[in-house]
């Protein structure tokens, strides 16, 4: 298996805000490839993670009144929860604040400094905090000038404002490696997918002459300090790019994964906006370290809206959580992979999203499965007849289309062309639906002399749907399993040597099939998605006049002296369990910072069926509530605060960095 080691990475995401479907696309796309390669017999290592250093993170933390570490800790929890929701099968989640990564970054910096690939100089230029990138005046999308014509600022290509920065900095000698990089590109034209982007890098960035790259900063502290000059922190691109190597154990005692997977096939997938850093800075950094370069760099386009890029101010941002909660996971995975052509941007519209669910998933695939299961139950008491080739005049055509679809699917998957891979699957689905119309099994069933033909039709239908279920497994795992379950077949374990004729004997379908994709009301669901998108738009604030505010209260007003009697503290959940004899109560053991753990009973069991998810959370409690006896044998020493809205209840938690026992007031 050593020759079939495969390493796939997402970019590490910058945790400065909530991730939308653009980031979800990249992560799902890598997940699809990882799952496909596993099913093709590869030993796969799939990496994703977060780029947690930098000035923007430091500023966000200061705005929130917490430490940068506490800020990124909280963001990491949210990102991991999103990847769990999207069923991402990553093998490791790296954070650039991980100790092992920071140590290697510092070591590499000093090594490059010692071999004169890094030198100390001074940088002056326009800098975008949001992009973590420097720009020349000619690179700015818009330039601001004063009345005398002097440049006073500008806008980066990303749309973010820039500021003038002048500071001492270390530089990476990119110029020294320019010729070697050009030679590598010429020898490996397949290095960047899609075709054309490699020439774009040569034409726009390399041929005009590579400038040495600033790789340290002194104006903020949230980063990896340079050991020999700690007033400098290592700037984003050395720190961030090295994650692909450090995650596998590069320059560490435990380096088995690096030896194994870096010497296998290495694929990086990134958005087109960060292609330059991955196609120029990263290869040169690896050349400096005398490390093999990756095999493929896949730079995909963006999901845009009818009115341009996603923007909260436009009210057109789409978050994956909303789509999954409303329509399930598989429609989202299918839509994103089907709708972004290689080398181009894709457009998201609510109309197209709902339409693809109804027409391609519910009609094409769902109805095919329902009709097949229903007919096998009706004509053969649920027993799928043995597969026999060529009984009807249409069997050969279906078999040929199936074999061609399988071959095309593999070709497009190897090229990471997901829209065409799925198109190959839907070609088979369409042909199978047509096969039903051509063979007319309801007519065959009326003539006992045509029983063999009817049996062949049923077995060919089941065999074709089985092939479809196998091919969609990397994209839509739940759907694949649901289809195979209704056919009475086992889950997919391999895509190698898949064939229509390779159908198991003695298989019984379920007694009654269920729709795998219920049809949606187009008008209602389109309106729902638009409403959710509009809800993501920041509210326009009107001028606030406190004298005009009318307070809306559920209870009578109290005096400040009354409220001041209540002591609210931060407490950490140490243990939680269901209370025997009650379907409402949970029993908590909490550390409220006063030296001894306390017990509180709370009637929230129905809102937290998996109560263990609360362990480790920091909650707010009323600490000086008089203890009371409950269920005859328990004493509850306080109250845990929660919020209720629309029948849903959520415990009020605080940032993990806040110490136990902290008083809230």
From Swiss-Prot:
A motif ('KMSKS' region) lies at residues 309-313. Its EC number is 6.1.1.10. Transmembrane segments: none annotated. It is an enzyme of class 6 (ligase). ATP binds at residue 312. Pfam families: Anticodon_3 (PF19303), tRNA-synt_1g (PF09334), tRNA_bind (PF01588). Residues 562-665 form the tRNA-binding domain. Homodimer. Is required not only for elongation of protein synthesis but also for the initiation of all mRNA translation through initiator tRNA(fMet) aminoacylation. This is Methionine--tRNA ligase. It comes from Streptococcus pneumoniae serotype 4 (strain ATCC BAA-334 / TIGR4). The gene is metG.
């Amino acid at each position: 298996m050593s020759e079939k080691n495969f390493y796939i990475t997402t970019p590490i995401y910058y945790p400065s805000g909530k991730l939308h479907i653009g980031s979800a696309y990249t992560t799902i796309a890598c997940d699809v490839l990882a799952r496909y390669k596993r099913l093709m017999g590869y030993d796969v290592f799939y990496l994703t993670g977060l780029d947690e250093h930098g000035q923007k993170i430091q500023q966000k933390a200061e705005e929130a009144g917490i430490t940068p570490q506490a800020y990124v800790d909280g963001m990491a929890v949210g990102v991991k929860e999103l990847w769990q929701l999207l069923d991402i099968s990553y093998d490791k989640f790296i954070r650039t604040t991980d100790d092992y990564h920071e140590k290697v970054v510092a070591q590499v910096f000093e090594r490059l400094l010692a071999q004169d690939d890094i030198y100390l100089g001074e940088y002056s230029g326009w800098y975008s905090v949001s992009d973590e990138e420097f720009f020349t005046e000619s690179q700015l999308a818009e330039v601001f000038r004063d009345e005398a014509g002097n440049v006073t600022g500008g806008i980066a290509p990303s749309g973010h404002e820039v500021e003038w920065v002048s500071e001492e900095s270390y530089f990476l000698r990119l110029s020294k490696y320019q010729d070697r990089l050009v030679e590598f590109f010429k020898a490996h034209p397949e290095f960047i997918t899609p075709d054309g982007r490699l020439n774009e890098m040569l034409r726009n960035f390399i041929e005009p002459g590579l400038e040495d790259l600033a790789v340290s900063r002194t104006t903020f502290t949230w980063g990896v300090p340079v050991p020999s000059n700690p007033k400098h922190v290592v700037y984003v691109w050395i720190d961030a790019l090295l994650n692909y190597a450090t995650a596998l154990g590069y320059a560490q005692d435990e380096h088995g994964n690096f030896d194994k997977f870096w010497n296998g096939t290495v694929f990086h997938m990134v958005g087109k906006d960060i292609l330059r850093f991955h196609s120029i800075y990263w290869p040169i950094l690896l050349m400096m370290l005398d490390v093999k370069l990756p095999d493929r760099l896949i730079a995909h386009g963006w999901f845009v809206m009818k009115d341009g890029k996603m923007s909260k101010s436009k009210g057109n941002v789409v978050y994956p959580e909303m789509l999954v909660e409303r329509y399930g996971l598989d429609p989202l995975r299918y839509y994103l992979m089907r709708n972004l052509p290689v080398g181009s941007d894709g457009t998201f519209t609510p109309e197209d999203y709902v339409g693809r669910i109804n027409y391609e998933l519910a009609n094409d695939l769902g109805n095919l499965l329902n009709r097949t299961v229903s007919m096998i139950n009706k004509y053969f008491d649920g027993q799928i007849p043995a597969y026999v080739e060529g009984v009807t005049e249409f069997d050969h055509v279906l078999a040929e289309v199936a074999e061609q679809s399988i071959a095309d699917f593999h070709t497009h998957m190897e090229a990471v062309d997901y829209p065409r891979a799925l198109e190959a699957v839907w070609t088979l689905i369409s042909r199978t639906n047509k096969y039903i119309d051509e063979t007319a099994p309801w007519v065959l069933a009326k003539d006992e002399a045509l029983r063999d033909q009817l049996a062949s039709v049923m077995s060919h239908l089941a065999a074709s749907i089985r092939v479809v279920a196998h091919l969609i497994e990397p994209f839509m795992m739940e759907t694949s399993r649901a289809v195979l379950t209704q056919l009475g077949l086992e889950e997919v374990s391999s895509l190698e040597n898949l064939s229509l004729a390779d159908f198991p004997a003695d298989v019984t379908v379920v007694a009654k099939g269920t729709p795998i994709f219920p049809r949606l009301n187009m008008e209602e669901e389109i309106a729902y998605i638009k409403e959710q998108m509009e809800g993501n738009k920041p509210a326009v604030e009107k001028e606030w006049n406190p004298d005009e505010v009318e307070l809306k209260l559920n209870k009578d007003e109290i005096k400040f002296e009354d409220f001041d009697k209540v002591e609210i503290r931060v407490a950490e959940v140490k243990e939680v369990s269901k209370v025997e004899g009650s379907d409402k109560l949970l029993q908590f053991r909490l550390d409220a910072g006063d030296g001894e753990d306390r017990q509180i009973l709370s009637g929230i069991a129905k809102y937290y069926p998996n109560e263990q998810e609360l362990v480790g959370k920091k909650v707010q409690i009323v600490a000086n509530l008089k203890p009371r006896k409950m269920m005859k044998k328990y004493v509850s020493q306080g109250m845990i605060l929660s919020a209720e809205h629309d029948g849903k209840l959520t415990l009020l938690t605080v940032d993990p960095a806040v110490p136990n026992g902290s008083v809230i007031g």
